Amino acid sequence: MISQSNTNNPISDNSSSRGLIPAPIVRSLRCPACQLHLSQDAHRLHCVNGHSFDRAKQGHVSLRLGGRTPLNADSSAMVVAREALLDTGLYGPIRNRSRELIASHAPSTSAPLVADLAGGTGYYLSGILDALPGSFGICIDLSAYALRRAAKCHPRSAAIGADLRDPLPLSTQSVSVAASFFGPRNIPEMQRVLRDDGILAIVTPTGQHLVELVDALGMLRVHELKDQRLAAKLSNFTPLVRERLTYQVAISRDQARNIASMGPSAHHMTPNQLDARVHQLPPHTDVTVSVNLGIYRQIRASRVVHA
């Protein structure tokens, strides 16, 4: 919650050992109300104009301002389902290949900053940070339930609440890696916060992703023009890597239920409806996991200048 405060007590770089947001991350944050840099004290983030943002007891901080109609943030049940599904390792190959590609193309700089947008529980961010020694990471998400988990996903990370429709609460050219896994994207803002040598990492589902469950469980389909729409939005970026990762795996009914419960399809069915559909599945179902992975760098001439 935003409030007025006259606090002005910045902390030293040993903040992570004291349970606070690591100082290199704080230096990249900016106030969503006035766009000035933020400082940190024992309980909150604040700017010199007196805007103050409390840190939740679980460790995350919301830098979201009011005024917009709220989106459907992930509920507690959705986050529990996602965490249970990810713990099985079903999406492990996506996590592993993504961090390999990112580590191969990330700029060589001291203490690079990684921003995972709509990062959920921090599952993918923690893998990236392990692959980039000395890096720091920010998981940005709208769901407080996801942020509670993301705040503890890695000792060099922080969890920040924000609406991706708004300007990101990050300084211009402060980010070395901007990542998006299955989530919504604000490409102009990602371009603004990226360093000139920074990279954009995007993972999106293909039309074959979980196709065996789409009809059986009434899940949402991937739009047939999804790839073309993304390409149009990335006109100011050049692709460094574009590849498809596809594999098949046998899943249980519980895993199928968690898959349907953890994403946007959960907003379009009741738990009872889902249980009835899952009950019709065999004990194990072979499903296809299929995603497009892309690494991009912005075209220098397209750099947008911001005051």
Task: For the regions a language model picked out, list residue spans one by one.
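Class I SAM-dependent methyltransferase Rossmann-like catalytic core
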Residues: 68-97
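Class I SAM-dependent methyltransferase SAM/SAH-binding core
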Residues: 113-116, 120-167
